[in-house]
UniProtKB/Swiss-Prot annotation:
The record marks 231-232, 247-248 as: Cleavage. The keyword Coiled coil applies. The lineage of its organism: Viruses, Riboviria, Orthornavirae, Duplornaviricota, Resentoviricetes. Belongs to the rotavirus VP4 family. This is Outer capsid protein VP4. Keywords: Capsid protein, Coiled coil, Hemagglutinin, Host cell membrane, Host endoplasmic reticulum, Host membrane, Host-virus interaction, Membrane, Outer capsid protein, Viral attachment to host cell, Viral penetration into host cytoplasm, Viral penetration via permeabilization of host membrane, Virion, Virus entry into host cell. GO terms for biological process: permeabilization of host organelle membrane involved in viral entry into host cell; virion attachment to host cell.
Length: 736
């Protein structure tokens, strides 16, 4: 099948970064870091702790601790080779950790069972539950590890040790023959430089030659004493900061207008205002195509946010645009089709800059044309909330991406200008720099499950809003006579020029679409149509590929085609929705489809229009995606029966006889979810006419039903009037 230009745009091969290609061509630097993962490769532990606290320093610089391991069996023979530590992240609730022994209690066989008991709970052994013995239940007054065991003459005993660390466990040592020592110790604090793992120990034989150790939760293993690593893991970085206090006495209102100088035509006015800034950060998660495990990107959007506040008794309507610069890029995932992966996700990290472009409806922005002595005193932001996003993969638990806090410090203020679809507005740009963050991490499921990746910085936000206050002052040159108005005070319409260009081009485009040769259109539709083809067709546009791609993508994201193509479960939709959604389903590899015809018309026509700007090209791409060939039909084939859906009706027919049959709506829905969906380029009426007029065979009918491109092209080349008439009918629908 031809590589549809629209399909490339839907699958996000081209995307915009930063501030969606700013009009002022500001720097949008992206820093890509290659990080030495160290022992996270083995331990997969986050260097952070959830919450608004310091960033924890990692000490896993050697591969001593490995895991987390998910296998449910540790063979007894592996315990006899050398000393080994079994380590656990402290569970959230009371849970069984491991057991060695038969399936049910047997007084003739030694056994032991390890539990984690959360403070304030009672723990009752599963293995020894059938015994009438008080030792089978232990009350945990603090977080504890509890070992239940029987061996030799001991019918049942238990050992409890404190588990105050975030991560800890026990030592298992080989002794004589086929026996091991289970060693336990109270894990209270990290005050000493060494740790005695053998405060208590007991020697155990193997229960039976066929019995190993059953593991009930994820665990880590260490072949050398892990105390140093566990100690360092819990010690946060310490930042020394200086605090100062001062008393400020204000003798007048901060919100004032002061005339600095004045003559007959002009006056200089100093404006001083209190100001409230709000920061809203929001991520955009873009899902790729394929099996449903592939996510293209997780990026921070440029956010437009409005809010109100009171300034000196006046209600102020404020508008801000929040964007970022100098972000880090990360990726995650495997290579197989069913491996969950993220192609790229942005991370706000140290030295990332946040830009807040601010304007409000007060008089100061109407008079902000010629300005000097601009200064601002703005507080910083600590943007904090516990935010998570869970990726909806088809099978298994949904992996989660988690972030919590990031601190922004104010650096400087500049004059700026914002362009919207309606007006151009003067504004102020407040620049903030990131100085610290709580870090991010990913989990295999909910937030309490295994960590699969982590790092410093801030990786996801759900639209939470934070606030800071400050004041601004500047001197503006304005007319002495208030009846004079500057152009910016009455605003200027930006979009009017684009609409005029589109109107001028519409008639030319539609005439050209009529005049393009039918064979040329179909030949182009069956060739690989890429974004490069589109750029080659409009050489008059003097912009970089990146700028053009970003602007086209920005416009295309608002089309109905783009929004409909993300739906995956077609069985949940009515027929009308299905017709707009099936374009994202795999088709026959040799088949022609409607999207390839529409993009071929567009590419073959735009090279004759002498386009000179990116906005006009983007508008044509978006309008052609939504408006070309509005009357589309789709079909599925199974066991010689064709199921067809058009905008007005649904029907089915026998492929051999072309006799209509009863339409099975349930089967149609199942096929639409699982089977290749074919664009009905040659409709049913044309198929019947071909059979009755030319007596074509079943094999040719099948190829026409399947929209086989070589077959359709051969009929076009031979000037078949029925096929030509059908294709021309489709092309006549291609109107801007």
């Amino acid at each position: 099948m031809a590589s549809s230009l629209y399909q490339q745009l839907i699958s996000q091969n081209y995307y915009s970064i930063g501030n969606e290609i700013l009009t002022d061509q500001q720097t949008t630097e992206t820093v890509v870091d290659y990080v030495d993962a160290g022992n996270y490769t083995y331990a997969q532990l986050p260097p952070t702790k959830w919450g608004a606290r310091g960033t924890f320093k990692s000490a896993f610089n050697v591969s001593n601790i490995t895991g987390p391991h998910t296998n449910t069996i540790i063979e007894w023979s592996n315990l006899l080779n050398s000393n080994g530590w079994v380590i656990y992240q402290k569970p959230a609730n009371t849970t069984k950790l491991f057991k060695h022994g038969p399936e049910t209690y047997n007084s003739n066989l030694a056994a032991f069972e390890l539990w984690y008991g959360k403070a304030g709970t009672s723990v009752t052994s599963d293995y020894y539950s059938s015994l009438q013995n008080n030792e089978k239940t232990v009350t945990a007054t603090s977080d504890s590890l509890i070992l239940f065991w029987n061996e030799g003459s001991t019918v049942l005993a238990n050992k409890k040790v404190n588990f105050s660390w975030d991560m800890g466990g026990m030592l298992i040592k080989p002794t004589r023959g086929n026996r091991v020592d289970i060693c336990m110790a109270n894990m209270n604090d990290f005050n000493s430089s060494i740790f005695n793992w053998e405060e208590w120990k007991h020697e155990f034989p193997r229960s039976d030659v066929n019995i190993n150790v059953n593991m009930y939760t994820d665990y880590y293993l260490a072949s050398e004493d892990p105390y140093t690593e566990l100690k360092a893991l819990q010690q946060p970085n310490i930042t020394t900061f200086e605090m100062k206090m001062m008393k400020i006495i204000r003798n007048g209102s901060i919100n004032l207008n002061e005339v600095v100088s004045k003559d007959s035509l002009w006056q200089e006015v100093r404006y001083a205002r209190d100001i409230t800034l709000e920061c809203k950060i929001e991520s955009e998660v873009v899902k790729g195509g394929g099996w449903g495990y592939d996510y293209t990107s997780v990026a921070f959007k440029t956010v437009n946010h409005t809010y109100t506040y009171t300034r000196a008794g006046e209600i102020v309507n404020a508008h801000v645009t929040i964007s970022f610069n100098n972000m880090k890029e990360r990726s995650y995932g495997g290579s197989l089709p069913t491996d969950f992966k993220i192609g790229r996700f942005d991370v706000i990290d140290t030295d990332t800059y946040m830009y807040i472009d601010y304007w409000d409806d007060s008089e100061i922005f109407k008079n902000m044309v010629y300005v000097r002595d601009l200064s601002a005193n703005i507080g910083g932001f600590f943007y904090y909330a516990e935010m998570s996003y869970y990726f909806q993969i088809p099978v298994g638990a949904h992996p989660g991406l988690h972030s919590s806090g990031v601190r922004f410090v104010y650096e400087r203020c500049l004059l700026s200008q914002q362009f919207t679809d309606q007006v151009a507005l003067n504004s102020m740009r407040f620049i903030f720099r990131v100085t610290e963050s709580n870090g991010w991490f990913m989990t295999s499921g909910n937030i309490n499950t295994r960590r699969i990746a982590s790092g410093t910085g801030f990786a996801y936000a759900d639209g939470h809003t934070s606030q800071t206050v400050g004041n601004i002052t500047f001197i503006s040159l304005i007319p002495s006579n208030p009846n004079y108005q500057t152009p910016i005070a009455s605003s200027s319409t930006v979009r009017m020029d684009l609409e005029r260009k589109i109107n001028d081009l519409r008639n030319d485009f539609n005439q050209l679409a009529n005049s393009v040769a039918l064979g040329d259109i179909l030949s182009l539709a069956t060739s690989p149509l890429t974004f490069a083809n589109l750029l080659e067709s409009v050489p008059a546009i003097a912009s970089s590929v990146k700028d053009v791609a970003a602007n086209v993508m920005k416009k295309f994201r608002n089309t109905k085609m783009f929004k409909k193509a993300t739906k995956a479960k077609y069985s949940e939709f009515i027929i009308g929705d299905l017709l707009e959604d099936v374009t994202n389903v795999a088709r026959n590899s040799n088949g022609m489809n409607f999207d390839d015809i529409t993009s071929a018309v567009m590419v073959s026509t735009t090279n004759k229009l002498q386009l000179t700007d990116v906005d006009t090209l983007s508008e044509i791409v978006a309008r052609s995606a939504d408006n070309f060939i509005p009357n589309r039909s789709y079909r599925m084939i199974e066991d010689g029966i064709v199921y067809e859906a058009t905008p007005k009706r649904t029907f089915s027919y026998d492929l051999t006889t072309l006799q209509q049959r009863e339409f099975d709506i349930d089967k149609f829905m199942r096929l639409a979810s699982k089977s290749p969906v074919i664009s009905a380029i040659v409709d049913f009426a044309t198929l019947k006419a071909m059979r009755e007029t030319y007596g074509v065979g079943t094999d040719v009918i099948y190829k026409l039903v399947a929209s086989d491109a070589p077959t359709i092209l051969s009929f076009i080349d031979n000037n078949n009037p029925l096929i030509k008439s059908r294709i021309e009918e489709l092309l006549r629908q291609c109107r801007l």
